[in-house]
Amino acid sequence: MAKKSLKILVDEMDDGMDEKLEKIGFEAYSVKKLRAEGLKLHTDFSVINYAKKNNMILITRDTESGEACDENTIPCILLDTNEIFKIVLDKLRQF
């Protein structure tokens, strides 16, 4: 069940996930869309800092961003390539 109190920031590599999360009740924002609105989110540091200042959970594929979040106790979901690979393998086994 979605928790509307969670605020989520989706890194630019997964732009569009914010819209899917919003449809199921999450408050989600896209780095790409926020940048288009004029926010200066051009570096990993600025993205992480924005998430921290706004009490957001960052969703990213960027390993360095994920590690920086961990080091600074900022909530983050790292979409690790190994996890994605496991999903691909599971799907391939269905054929």
Residue locations for each model-derived region?
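Acidic, PIN/NYN-like endoribonuclease modules and their adjacent C-terminal/linker elements
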Residues: 2, 11-24, 30-33, 39, ...
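A general structural motif
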Residues: 3-5, 55
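Short secondary-structure boundary micro-motifs
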Residues: 4, 41, 60-62
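Short, hydrophobic beta-strand segments that form beta-sheet elements in well-ordered domains
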Residues: 8-12, 57-60
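Intrinsic disorder
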Residues: 29-30, 61
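Amphipathic, hydrophobic secondary-structure cores in small proteins
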Residues: 49-54
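Acidic, metal-binding active-site segment of PIN/NYN-like and related structure-specific nucleases
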Residues: 55-71
